[in-house]
Design a protein with these regions (language model features):
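Conserved beta-sheet core of the metallophosphoesterase superfamily
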Residues: 84-85, 94-101, 106-134
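Core catalytic region of metal-dependent phosphoesterases/phosphodiesterases
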Residues: 2-95
Length: 134
Protein backbone atom coordinates (compact mmCIF):
# COMPACT_ATOMS: atom_id res chain seq x y z
CA UNK A 1 0.00 0.00 0.00
CA UNK A 2 1.24 3.49 -0.83
CA UNK A 3 0.80 6.33 1.68
CA UNK A 4 0.99 10.10 1.41
CA UNK A 5 1.65 11.86 4.72
CA UNK A 6 0.79 15.49 5.45
CA UNK A 7 0.40 17.75 8.45
CA UNK A 8 -0.28 21.33 9.46
CA UNK A 9 -2.40 22.48 6.52
CA UNK A 10 -3.84 25.18 8.82
CA UNK A 11 -6.75 26.01 6.53
CA UNK A 12 -4.68 26.77 3.43
CA UNK A 13 -6.88 25.87 0.46
CA UNK A 14 -3.87 26.52 -1.78
CA UNK A 15 -1.67 23.89 -0.12
CA UNK A 16 -4.59 21.52 0.33
CA UNK A 17 -5.23 21.60 -3.44
CA UNK A 18 -1.52 20.86 -4.02
CA UNK A 19 -1.75 17.99 -1.53
CA UNK A 20 -4.75 16.49 -3.31
CA UNK A 21 -3.04 16.82 -6.69
CA UNK A 22 0.10 15.11 -5.40
CA UNK A 23 -1.96 12.38 -3.71
CA UNK A 24 -3.67 11.63 -7.02
CA UNK A 25 -0.39 11.76 -8.98
CA UNK A 26 1.20 9.29 -6.57
CA UNK A 27 -1.79 6.94 -6.91
CA UNK A 28 -1.63 6.38 -3.16
CA UNK A 29 -4.24 4.34 -1.32
CA UNK A 30 -4.19 6.18 2.01
CA UNK A 31 -3.72 9.80 3.09
CA UNK A 32 -2.27 10.05 6.60
CA UNK A 33 -3.00 13.44 8.16
CA UNK A 34 -1.16 14.45 11.33
CA UNK A 35 -3.43 17.22 12.56
CA UNK A 36 -3.85 21.00 12.42
CA UNK A 37 -6.11 20.86 9.40
CA UNK A 38 -8.36 23.94 9.43
CA UNK A 39 -7.47 26.61 12.00
CA UNK A 40 -4.27 28.65 11.63
CA UNK A 41 -3.67 29.04 15.36
CA UNK A 42 -3.37 32.25 17.36
CA UNK A 43 0.44 32.38 17.04
CA UNK A 44 0.58 31.76 13.29
CA UNK A 45 0.02 34.19 10.42
CA UNK A 46 -2.82 33.44 8.02
CA UNK A 47 -1.61 30.87 5.48
CA UNK A 48 -1.80 31.33 1.72
CA UNK A 49 -5.45 31.29 0.52
CA UNK A 50 -6.82 30.72 4.02
CA UNK A 51 -10.28 29.17 3.70
CA UNK A 52 -11.39 26.65 6.27
CA UNK A 53 -14.54 25.72 4.35
CA UNK A 54 -12.72 25.15 1.05
CA UNK A 55 -10.02 23.17 2.83
CA UNK A 56 -12.69 21.04 4.54
CA UNK A 57 -14.44 20.44 1.20
CA UNK A 58 -11.20 19.30 -0.45
CA UNK A 59 -10.39 16.94 2.42
CA UNK A 60 -13.98 15.64 2.56
CA UNK A 61 -13.70 14.71 -1.11
CA UNK A 62 -10.98 12.24 -0.05
CA UNK A 63 -12.60 11.13 3.22
CA UNK A 64 -12.64 7.41 2.44
CA UNK A 65 -8.84 7.45 2.02
CA UNK A 66 -7.99 9.50 5.13
CA UNK A 67 -6.59 8.35 8.46
CA UNK A 68 -6.16 11.38 10.71
CA UNK A 69 -4.99 12.30 14.20
CA UNK A 70 -5.86 15.48 16.08
CA UNK A 71 -3.48 18.43 16.29
CA UNK A 72 -3.23 21.17 18.88
CA UNK A 73 -5.12 23.64 16.62
CA UNK A 74 -7.95 21.20 15.83
CA UNK A 75 -11.18 21.68 17.78
CA UNK A 76 -14.57 20.14 18.35
CA UNK A 77 -16.02 22.63 15.87
CA UNK A 78 -13.82 21.09 13.14
CA UNK A 79 -15.59 17.77 13.62
CA UNK A 80 -18.82 19.45 12.50
CA UNK A 81 -17.46 20.24 9.01
CA UNK A 82 -15.06 17.35 8.46
CA UNK A 83 -16.64 14.06 7.39
CA UNK A 84 -13.92 11.82 8.83
CA UNK A 85 -12.72 11.28 12.43
CA UNK A 86 -10.09 13.69 13.78
CA UNK A 87 -10.36 13.20 17.55
CA UNK A 88 -7.70 10.56 18.30
CA UNK A 89 -4.33 11.69 19.66
CA UNK A 90 -2.65 8.60 18.14
CA UNK A 91 -3.18 6.10 15.38
CA UNK A 92 -1.39 2.76 15.17
CA UNK A 93 -0.87 1.39 11.67
CA UNK A 94 0.76 -2.03 11.14
CA UNK A 95 2.95 -2.03 8.01
CA UNK A 96 4.66 -5.34 7.39
CA UNK A 97 7.02 -6.15 10.25
CA UNK A 98 6.83 -2.58 11.57
CA UNK A 99 4.24 -0.36 13.19
CA UNK A 100 3.68 3.28 12.27
CA UNK A 101 2.71 5.38 15.28
CA UNK A 102 1.01 8.54 14.05
CA UNK A 103 0.64 11.61 16.27
CA UNK A 104 0.63 15.36 15.88
CA UNK A 105 3.52 15.55 18.32
CA UNK A 106 2.66 18.60 20.38
CA UNK A 107 2.26 17.09 23.84
CA UNK A 108 1.64 13.36 24.01
CA UNK A 109 4.03 10.59 23.16
CA UNK A 110 3.26 6.96 22.59
CA UNK A 111 5.37 4.14 23.96
CA UNK A 112 7.46 2.86 21.06
CA UNK A 113 8.84 -0.62 20.63
CA UNK A 114 11.98 -1.61 18.75
CA UNK A 115 11.30 -1.23 15.03
CA UNK A 116 8.33 1.13 15.41
CA UNK A 117 8.23 4.26 13.28
CA UNK A 118 7.06 7.52 14.88
CA UNK A 119 5.42 9.87 12.37
CA UNK A 120 4.56 13.34 13.68
CA UNK A 121 3.81 16.86 12.51
CA UNK A 122 3.53 20.07 14.57
CA UNK A 123 7.03 21.47 14.00
CA UNK A 124 6.52 22.74 10.41
CA UNK A 125 9.94 21.35 9.45
CA UNK A 126 10.30 18.30 7.19
CA UNK A 127 12.78 15.85 8.69
CA UNK A 128 13.71 12.19 8.76
CA UNK A 129 15.70 10.82 11.69
CA UNK A 130 16.81 7.31 12.48
CA UNK A 131 17.18 6.74 16.21
CA UNK A 132 17.25 3.96 18.72
CA UNK A 133 14.39 3.50 21.15
CA UNK A 134 15.00 5.20 24.51
Amino acid sequence: MKYVIASDIHGSAYYCRLLKKRYEEEKAQKLLLLGDLLYHGARNALPKEYSTLETAAILNSMKSDILCVRGNCDSDVDTMVLEFPIVAAFAILPVGAHTLVLTHGHNEYAVLKEGDVLVNGHFHVPAFERRGVY
